[in-house]
């Protein structure tokens, strides 16, 4: 088996793109980098590190082929002028002294994770670095700051940012007496809490915010983080402090972000909008992404799409990350859970967001307490490898800030500009996530159109965190495009499971319309439409 591992999770324009080739490579094997299916660079390779040179900004699929053009292995790379414009988010949770970090580095490189959340690295929630060099965290997990620093160094070596976890308003029992005057209280006068061990204060209380900002600054100085994942628990929305002061918690969160940014002007900050609260207020605050952790009532694929779409509207170009924990792996076989994860990724990627899911060496998130994670089975690891490669390779068609949805303006019988049918099976095509149908979405990316076809045929519902059936075969699709001139359009398709690289399909002309026969979709098919071959030959 041959494995391709980029040396970086993301490359800058002045960095050569280097690919480590692991395994026995046949003589004459060639490594090729393609941008949207078009060859940009290639080189002959053997064992070791292959140099594809410097590449222009963009996403690239990278294939290793033998002399007969058979594909031996694939990966992807992205070149970006601004690393903070991209966030493919991962996590680590294990800080035991002396642990081997090699497999963690491999996973970051394989899945192209550009940011890593250091979950529960701190001594206490209200005293981040007060435990010395070796301690147990608030829930008894062992932490060595030497291991934390080694993980940070590892992130830097592969081009990822290391973000320390910090809850913006949580205080443990040991520190509570010092801070209970800032408590946020229920109507009955009890302090809001998480379980029975963390109590909630007003994050914008003057003395608390001074303490919190000093604590994160000390953590940067002593440990070396590139920034922070600023957490909250989604409640309360409004409350009173112990002194009777009414608190609009959304405003307090914005104040907190502003104060942390003032204290750490060069750091990368990501705030958690739990269940979309308060994205409308926090998205414009001085942070580097819009991050949302979803819970009921966001239970369906369409709910994920709605959350991602609203977030992109508020984000003003910042990357959007959705934390959607796939609890399904705890209760279902890997095969049906993998399909649930694939449909979650298809929904989020096609709506311009990424998913916080993967981390450590081989783990995925199935619980909000990240220490309770799930070890991936081989099928899951292979799925994630394929789909994360696909995300990176087609980034400018998926997550670029300027992408606009045009489904309602182009599809359907009234518009009749771009649409698809499945004549062999009569499978319905819809504007929303509907069981038994193809979910069709059309976006405009520059002067191109992108059609996303998510196959929900064979599903009895559209829950994103439930076991999924094998997708039903719907047959080939007939794509219909209203022509914009005498030049025929160019149509290409890609599928993360069946043909990850964009390939051309034949286009025929009939009066004012062009038609193309699309391969049968599996779970998600991306169709790239160039209205004129003269523009994109």
Where are these regions (language model features)?
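Aromatic/acidic polysaccharide-binding cleft in carbohydrate-active enzymes
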Residues: 232, 318-413
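Active-site-adjacent "subsite" loops/lids of carbohydrate-active enzymes
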Residues: 83, 93-98, 164-223
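Carbohydrate-binding surface patches
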Residues: 422-485, 525
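Active-site neighborhood of glycoside hydrolase catalytic domains
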Residues: 204-290, 295-306, 315
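An acidic-aromatic substrate-binding cleft motif
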Residues: 72-124
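The substrate-binding groove and active-site-proximal loops of carbohydrate-active enzymes
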Residues: 86-99, 129-145, 194-210, 234, ...
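C-terminal beta-strand-rich structural cap/linker in extracellular carbohydrate-active enzymes
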Residues: 509-537
């Amino acid at each position: 088996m041959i494995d391709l591992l980029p040396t970086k999770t993301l490359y800058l324009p002045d960095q050569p793109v280097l690919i480590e080739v692991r395994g026995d490579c046949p003589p004459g094997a060639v490594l090729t980098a393609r941008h949207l299916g078009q060859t940009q660079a290639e080189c002959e390779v053997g064992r070791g590190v292959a140099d594809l040179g410097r590449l222009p900004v963009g996403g690239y699929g990278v294939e290793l082929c033998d002399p007969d053009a058979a594909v031996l292995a694939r990966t992807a790379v992205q070149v970006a002028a601004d690393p903070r414009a991209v966030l493919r988010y991962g996590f680590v949770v294990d800080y035991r002294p002396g642990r081997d970090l090699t497999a963690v580095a491999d996973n970051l490189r394989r899945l192209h994770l550009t940011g890593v959340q250091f979950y529960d690295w701190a001594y206490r929630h209200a005293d981040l670095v007060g435990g010395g060099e070796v301690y147990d965290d608030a829930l008894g997990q062992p932490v060595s700051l030497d291991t934390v620093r080694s993980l940070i160094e590892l992130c830097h070596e592969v081009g990822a940012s290391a973000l320390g976890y910090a809850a913006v308003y949580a205080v443990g029992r040991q520190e509570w007496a010092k801070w209970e005057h800032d408590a946020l209280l229920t109507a009955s006068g009890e302090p809001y809490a998480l379980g029975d061990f963390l109590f909630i204060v007003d994050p914008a209380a003057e003395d608390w915010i001074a303490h919190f900002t000093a604590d994160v600054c000390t953590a940067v100085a002593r440990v070396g983080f590139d920034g922070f994942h600023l957490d909250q628990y989604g409640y309360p929305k409004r409350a009173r402090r112990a002194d009777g002061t009414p608190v609009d918690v959304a405003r307090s969160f914005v104040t907190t972000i502003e104060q942390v940014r003032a204290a750490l002007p060069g750091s990368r900050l990501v705030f958690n909008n739990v269940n979309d609260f308060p994205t409308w207020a926090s998205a414009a605050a001085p942070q580097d992404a819009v991050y949302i952790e979803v819970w009921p009532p966001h239970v369906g694929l369409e709910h994920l799409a709605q959350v991602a779409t609203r977030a992109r509207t508020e984000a003003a170009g910042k990357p959007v990350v959705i934390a959607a924990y796939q609890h399904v792996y705890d209760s279902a076989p890997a095969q049906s859970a993998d399909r649930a994860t694939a449909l979650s990724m298809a929904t989020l990627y096609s709506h311009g967001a990424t998913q916080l899911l993967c981390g450590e060496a081989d783990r995925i998130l199935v619980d909000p307490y990240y220490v309770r994670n799930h070890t991936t089975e081989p099928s899951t690891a292979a799925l994630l490898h394929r789909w994360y490669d696909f995300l990176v390779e087609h980034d400018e068609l998926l997550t670029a800030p300027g992408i606009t949805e045009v489904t309602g303006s182009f599809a359907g019988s009234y518009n009749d500009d771009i649409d698809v049918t499945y004549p062999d099976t009569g499978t319905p095509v819809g504007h929303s996530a509907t069981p038994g149908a193809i979910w069709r979405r059309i976006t405009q990316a520059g002067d191109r159109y992108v059609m996303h076809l998510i196959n929900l045929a064979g599903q009895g519902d559209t829950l994103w965190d439930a076991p999924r059936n094998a997708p039903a075969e719907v047959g080939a699709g007939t794509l219909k495009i209203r022509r914009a001139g005498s030049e025929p359009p160019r149509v290409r398709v890609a599928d993360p499971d069946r043909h990850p690289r964009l390939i051309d399909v034949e286009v025929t002309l009939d009066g004012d319309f062009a038609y193309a026969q699309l391969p049968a979709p599996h779970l998600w098919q991306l169709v790239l439409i160039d209205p004129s071959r003269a523009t994109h030959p």
